[in-house]
Each structure stands twice: as C-alpha cells, then as structure tokens.
Curated annotation (Swiss-Prot):
InterPro entries: MZT1 (IPR022214). Pfam families: MOZART1. One of its GO terms (biological process) is gamma-tubulin complex localization. Its main location: cytoplasm. This is Mitotic-spindle organizing protein 1. Keywords: Cytoplasm, Cytoskeleton. GO terms for cellular component: cytoplasm; gamma-tubulin ring complex; interphase microtubule organizing center; spindle. It is found in: Cytoplasm, Cytoskeleton, Microtubule organizing center; Cytoplasm, Cytoskeleton, Spindle. Required for gamma-tubulin complex recruitment to the microtubule organizing centers (MTOCs). The keyword Cytoplasm applies. It comes from the Eukaryota.
Amino acid sequence: MDRTAAQNARESLDLAFSISNFLQTGLDRHTLSILIALCEHGVNPEALAAVVKELRREAAALHQHQDQS
C-alpha cells in the first residue's frame, strides 16, 4: 500500500471511529477496523451487526453469571 492509500485508509478509519463514538456503539478502534475489513470483503453488514449484538448478550450473561457465583 502506498503512502497516499495508507493515509486515506487511516483518515477513513478515523472518521468511522468518530461516527461510531458519536453513536455510542461501544466498538473500539481495532474491532471497528476488523468489521470494516469484513464488510469490504463482502460480509453482510447486517449479519455482522447481529453477531456483535449476540456476542455482547452472551458476554453480559456470562459476566452476570460470574458475579452471582
């Protein structure tokens, strides 16, 4: 990747991360970059959103179970 392309990619990720924070998605920069890359490779964004939601539900249930133990 040349310098200009790398700079454009960085700026695009910065913008996406700013929007993500504004929308209070709770996604960190690294996770967001992975999700964007998956979308760029043809993964359905709605399916990814469903997976993220399910993983968050599972993590919350696990934490709740651990707190009760």
